[in-house]
């Protein structure tokens, strides 16, 4: 009987020691860190600076004879250059980049800056205004970091997700959250058709075209729009 008792005590101590090794022993061990993931993925997310020529908006006053003379200046009819700020994601080593159509679709000049400060000119290969997507080609690019794609069919609500982009032009930032919803319609956000993934990771102006990635660094989707009353999700300190 004593042998069985000793064996039980020894087994219990061994199990207890193993469990103690698995249980976090300090706050530092409990803390979740995305540092390795960000180091791996962030270099494939780029900042996009685009120049768009826009025509002055028509005003109903121009049809009024009294005000017509004030609008006869030919210079007022000329298109004006506007700067568009956004983000993009490198999909291949030779410089294929995906972004939003509203960032680059009507641009006359596109400049792409990588996280390591390398800079490239870019041209639009394909554009889809309905789904707000555009494919770019970086001129003379090679051996670039890029993100692998993940099929949307395997994405589940509740998964951790990171949003990487250039909000407000402050430089590349990373925010975290979860996948909050799937198969959202773009009509609610005024972006037309399409399949949209909803996340609670803070996304702000300038994040458009940036990456939403999973914990393995795979691309879940492209940050496209925000439903907000304040104009942003903030999360910028």
Q: Language-model segments: which ranges?
A:
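Positively charged n-region of N-terminal signal peptides that target proteins for export
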Residues: 1-5
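Serine-dependent protease modules
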Residues: 20-237
């Amino acid at each position: 009987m004593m042998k069985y008792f000793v064996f039980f005590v020894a087994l219990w101590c061994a199990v207890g020691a193993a469990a103690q090794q698995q249980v976090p022993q300090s706050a530092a061990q409990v803390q979740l860190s995305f540092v390795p993931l960000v180091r791996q993925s962030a270099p494939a997310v780029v900042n996009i600076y685009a120049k768009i020529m826009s025509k002055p908006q028509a005003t109903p006053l121009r049809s009024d004879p009294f005000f017509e003379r004030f609008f006869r200046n030919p210079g007022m009819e000329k298109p004006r250059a506007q700067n568009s700020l956004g983000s993009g994601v490198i999909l291949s080593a030779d410089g294929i980049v995906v972004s939003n159509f509203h960032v680059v679709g009507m641009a006359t000049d596109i400049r792409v800056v990588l996280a390591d400060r390398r800079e490239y000119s870019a041209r639009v290969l394909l554009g889809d205004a309905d789904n707000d997507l555009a494919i770019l080609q970086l001129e003379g690019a090679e051996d670039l970091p890029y993100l692998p794609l993940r099929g949307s069919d395997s994405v589940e609500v509740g998964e951790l997700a990171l949003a990487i982009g250039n909000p407000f032009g402050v430089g590349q930032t990373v925010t975290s959250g979860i996948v909050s919803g799937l198969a959202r319609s773009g009509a609610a956000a005024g972006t037309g058709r399409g399949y949209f993934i909803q996340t609670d990771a803070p996304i702000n102006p300038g994040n458009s075209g940036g990456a939403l990635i999973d914990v393995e660094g795979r691309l879940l989707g492209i940050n496209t729009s925000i439903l907000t009353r304040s104009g942003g999700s903030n999360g910028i300190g």
